[in-house]
């Protein structure tokens, strides 16, 4: 058996053997690095995906990071899908003197949707004028008025029980819905910027001028 000290001395005296030893060491080191990279690869890709998801979530204003239920099938809809749009948020009711505003809201949506306007309707019985049967709300909205903009299941819009979106709208604008068909405008950055009472019709110039102003502004 060769003594370790003699083996080292032999390597020093023979350059070829020394060069070969260094090559073997380098190959082993490279193999270890490659193995570590392969082992970390899926995790690294997973981390990248996680960062991408986090970035997407971060691009959604907190005011819109709310889950609501779609009227038609009660599927969960996160309002982040409307980030970057100008939003007209309205609390609605089926048995109100202003119910006919559904027609004007649909016209408004049809006129401006290609420029980035989305009307979001939230039926509510806070003022005692909404149908208890969801199917009746659907019939009124989709059959009677031919509504195509998003409508959600009945939800509270006033007081401590108001849904998270309306709590934000009320806090930011300082105006709570005093009646059905109160209207809030939200800019492309998710910031509530204006509120209009029920008697302001959807095609009222005061409302349409503000919509056009917001549509002309880019997301910042």
Predicted regions and their residues:
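N-terminal secretory signal peptides that target proteins for export/translocation
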Residues: 1-17
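Residue-level signal for well-ordered, solvent-exposed loop/turn and beta-edge residues enriched
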Residues: 3, 74-75, 191
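Thiol-/selenol-based redox modules, centered on thioredoxin-like
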Residues: 164-167, 171-220
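Bacterial N-terminal signal peptides
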Residues: 22-34
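Amphipathic alpha-helical repeat scaffolds
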Residues: 91-95
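N-terminal "domain-start" segment that seeds a small globular fold
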Residues: 43-80, 100
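Loop/turn elements at helix/coil->beta-strand transitions in domains of secreted/extracellular proteins
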Residues: 83-87, 113-118, 145-150, 180, ...
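Structural microenvironment flanking redox-active thiols in thiol-disulfide oxidoreductases
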Residues: 98-162
């Amino acid at each position: 058996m060769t003594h370790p000290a003699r083996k080292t001395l032999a390597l020093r005296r023979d350059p070829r053997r020394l060069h070969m030893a260094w090559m073997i060491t380098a190959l082993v080191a490279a193999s270890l690095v490659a193995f570590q990279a392969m082992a970390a690869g899926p995790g690294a890709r997973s981390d990248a995906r996680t960062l991408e998801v986090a970035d997407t979530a971060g691009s959604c204003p907190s005011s819109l990071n709310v889950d609501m239920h779609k009227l038609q099938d009660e599927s969960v809809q996160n309002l982040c899908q409307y980030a970057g749009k100008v939003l007209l948020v309205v609390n609605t009711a089926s048995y109100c003197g202003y119910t006919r505003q559904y027609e004007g809201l649909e016209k408004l949506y049809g006129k401006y949707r290609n420029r980035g306007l989305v009307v979001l309707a939230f039926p509510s019985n806070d003022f005692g004028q909404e149908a208890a049967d969801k199917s009746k709300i659907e019939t009124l909205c989709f059959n009677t008025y031919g509504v195509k903009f998003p409508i959600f299941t009945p939800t509270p819009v006033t007081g401590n029980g108001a849904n998270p979106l309306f709590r934000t709208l009320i806090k930011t604008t300082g105006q709570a819905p005093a009646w059905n068909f109160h209207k809030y405008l939200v800019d492309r950055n998710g910031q509530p910027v204006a509120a209009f009472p029920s008697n302001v019709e959807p095609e009222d110039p005061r409302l349409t001028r503000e919509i056009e102003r917001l549509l002309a502004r880019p997301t910042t």
